[in-house]
Every structure is written in structure tokens, then in C-alpha cells.
């Protein structure tokens, strides 16, 4: 690839201050070249690894009740590291179910302990703009966003950015588009 450190440096120079990575090791490498960046771990975290994430101020994207429970119980008093909440709005692969999201939103004590900085979902069919699932996911995400007032939201992945501004919410997550991928039919 292009190398995580050179890419992170270039993105910081261009004004990017939020990153999404898959693995903690990638987050640590970005932290070394972008000390002030907000870094999310899309794959959540391995049970028992909360302390390491807190040490490097890496924010897990929580996508299961077990991850929610462990992160809420983690001692973050000296390092107030936040998290993101991932809700499955139709991809049927990652994230809390809508029922789990509603339960979390109602559990005010747990929600306060988590201190979520972002609510996300992932578009399953954004690379096919006319696919009806895009609209269904948008509506589902709007509904779940209402459950978490004041928490910034992110729905658009690379292809989702090209679906239009209504999919952008507070933060778009360009990934492969940064490297020139094109998402257009015809």
C-alpha cells in the first residue's frame, strides 16, 4: 500500500483530524504521526483490551452488547476516552440491532458511562445508487439518531458520499475513495 504514516501525514496536512482504522496497531501508528487526531477502531476491540485503547486514546466502535458492557465498565477516569456506537440499519453484518440500540438509549446510566462521541452505521448498497436499501437505511438511521440526541452521526462511507448530502450527517467516512475509487454507474 501507500503506507499508513505517509497517508496519515498527508491527510492531517489537508485538514483531516478524524481517522477510522481496523486494528489497534494501525491506530497506534497514526497516533505517532498525528498526536491530536481522533482515531476510531471500526472493528471494536478484543475483550480485555480496553486498557490499551485508553492508553493511546483510541476510540472503539462498539457493535455488540458485550462490547458496550465492557467499555462502560472500563476505568477511564484518568483518560476520558470516548467511543462510537455502531447500529445495524440494514447491512445485517455489524452493529447493534435496532432493538439493542433502543435498549441502550433507554439505559441512561450505561449511556452516560460510555460517553459516545459518534453514532454510525454502514450503507450496504451505496455503490448502487438506485438500490431501495439505501433509502431504507437512511430512514432507519434517522430514527436511531433520534434515540441519541446530541451525539454526532455518520452514515456515508465512500460510495455513500455520492448519494447526496442527506446521507452525510455530521461526518462522512471516505475510505477507498481517497485512493481514486469511482462510484458511478455507466
Segments (PLM) and residue ranges:
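Active-site loop/helix belt of alpha/beta enzymes
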Residues: 1-14, 68-82, 87-186
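N-terminal active-site wall of soluble small-molecule enzyme domains
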Residues: 1-58, 62-71
Amino acid at each position: 500500500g501507500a503506507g499508513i504514516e505517509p497517508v496519515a501525514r498527508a491527510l492531517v496536512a489537508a485538514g483531516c483530524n478524524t481517522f477510522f482504522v481496523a486494528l489497534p496497531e494501525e491506530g497506534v501508528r497514526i497516533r505517532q504521526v498525528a498526536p491530536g487526531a481522533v482515531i476510531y477502531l471500526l472493528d471494536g476491540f478484543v475483550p480485555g483490551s480496553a486498557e490499551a485503547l485508553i492508553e493511546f486514546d483510541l476510540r472503539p466502535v462498539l457493535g455488540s452488547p458485550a462490547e458496550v458492557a465492557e467499555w462502560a465498565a472500563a476505568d477511564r477516569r484518568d483518560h476520558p476516552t470516548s467511543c462510537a456506537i455502531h447500529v445495524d440499519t440494514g447491512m445485517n453484518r455489524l452493529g447493534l440491532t435496532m432493538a439493542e440500540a433502543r435498549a441502550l438509549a433507554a439505559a441512561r446510566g450505561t449511556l452516560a458511562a460510555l460517553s459516545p462521541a459518534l453514532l454510525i452505521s454502514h450503507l450496504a448498497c451505496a455503490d448502487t445508487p438506485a438500490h431501495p436499501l439505501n433509502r431504507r437505511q437512511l430512514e432507519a438511521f434517522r430514527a436511531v439518531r433520534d434515540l441519541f440526541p446530541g451525539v454526532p452521526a455518520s452514515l456515508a462511507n465512500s460510495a455513500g458520499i455520492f448519494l447526496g448530502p442527506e446521507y452525510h450527517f455530521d461526518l462522512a467516512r471516505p475510505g477507498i475513495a481517497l485512493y481514486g475509487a469511482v462510484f458511478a454507474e455507466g
